[in-house]
C-alpha cells in the first residue's frame, strides 16, 4: 500500500484539539455582541462573558491552580457556573461540579477523593459546604459566590467571586489543550451501591 509505514504528522494546518474552550474563543471573535447570559436583571453578551472567564482563569492561576488540578463547584444554574465551566479548562484544570442536593458527607468524600485544590460555592449552600470542608479535612481556597438573584447565605470563603475576578486579567492568554483527551471535568455517580464513583470527561468528550 502506498501509505504503508508512513504517518501524517499533526500540525496547525491539519489538526486542532476539540474543546469547548474553542467555542468561547470563536464566539468572542465572531459574535461578541450577542446575548450570552440572562439571569434576573443580569444581561451580558459573549464579549463580556469571555472577559469574565479570562479574569477567572487568570485569578485562579495567580492563586496556584494549574494544569491537572481539580476545582470544585457547588452552585445551581447561574452565570458563575457557566463561567467556571469555561474558565477552569482554560488552565488545563479539571472542573468538579457538584449536585447542590448532595449532603455534607457526600460532598466531603468527593472533595477528598477528587483532591480539590479550590472550591467555589454559592452562599445559598454555605452551611452544607462548611460542614463538608470540616469533614474532609482539606485546607483549600474557598471562594464565595454571592448570587444577587438568590437567597444568599453566610460567607465562608477567603474572598468573593467578584473580588477574585477583580484580581484577574481580562486579556489572559489561554490556549487549547495539547491533547484533546486531557481531562476537562470530574463528575461523580450517585453512589447507589456504595461510594460515588468519579467519571472523567475529556475535552473531546465534552465537545462531542
Question: Model segments located where?
Answer:
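Conserved pre-ATP/AMP-binding loop-to-beta segment of ANL
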Residues: 32, 143, 157-159, 167-188, ...
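Conserved AMP-binding/adenylate-forming core of the ANL superfamily
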Residues: 16, 33-86, 103-108, 162-163
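Conserved S/T- and glycine-rich ATP-binding loop of Class I adenylate-forming
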Residues: 71, 88, 119, 183, ...
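Flexible acidic/glycine-rich loop/turn elements at helix↔coil and beta-strand↔loop transitions
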Residues: 26-32
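Surface-exposed loop/turn positions
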Residues: 35, 69, 93, 181-182
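Conserved AMP-binding A3 loop
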Residues: 45-47, 184-208
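Flexible, non-catalytic linker and terminal segments flanking ANL/adenylate-forming cores
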Residues: 1-17
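Structural core segment of the AMP-binding/adenylate-forming
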Residues: 62-63, 90-166
Amino acid at each position: 500500500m502506498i501509505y504503508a509505514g508512513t504517518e501524517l504528522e499533526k500540525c496547525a494546518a491539519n489538526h486542532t484539539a476539540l474543546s469547548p474552550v474553542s467555542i468561547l474563543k470563536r464566539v468572542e471573535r465572531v459574535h461578541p455582541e450577542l446575548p450570552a447570559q440572562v439571569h434576573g436583571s443580569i444581561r451580558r453578551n459573549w464579549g463580556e462573558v469571555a472577559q469574565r472567564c479570562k479574569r477567572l482563569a487568570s485569578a485562579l492561576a495567580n492563586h496556584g491552580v494549574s494544569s491537572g488540578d481539580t476545582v470544585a463547584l457547588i452552585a445551581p444554574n447561574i452565570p458563575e457556573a457557566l463561567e467556571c465551566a469555561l474558565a477552569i479548562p482554560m488552565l488545563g484544570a479539571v472542573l468538579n461540579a457538584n449536585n447542590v442536593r448532595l449532603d455534607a458527607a457526600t460532598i466531603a468524600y468527593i472533595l477528598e477523593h477528587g483532591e480539590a485544590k479550590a472550591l467555589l460555592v454559592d452562599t445559598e449552600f454555605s452551611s452544607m459546604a462548611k460542614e463538608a470542608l470540616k469533614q474532609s479535612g482539606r485546607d483549600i481556597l474557598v471562594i464565595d459566590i454571592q448570587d444577587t438573584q438568590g437567597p444568599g447565605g453566610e460567607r465562608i470563603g477567603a474572598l468573593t467571586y467578584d473580588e477574585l475576578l477583580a484580581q484577574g486579567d481580562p486579556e489572559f492568554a489561554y490556549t487549547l489543550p495539547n491533547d484533546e483527551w486531557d481531562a476537562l471535568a470530574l463528575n461523580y455517580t450517585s453512589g447507589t451501591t456504595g461510594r460515588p464513583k468519579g467519571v472523567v470527561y475529556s475535552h473531546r468528550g465534552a465537545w462531542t
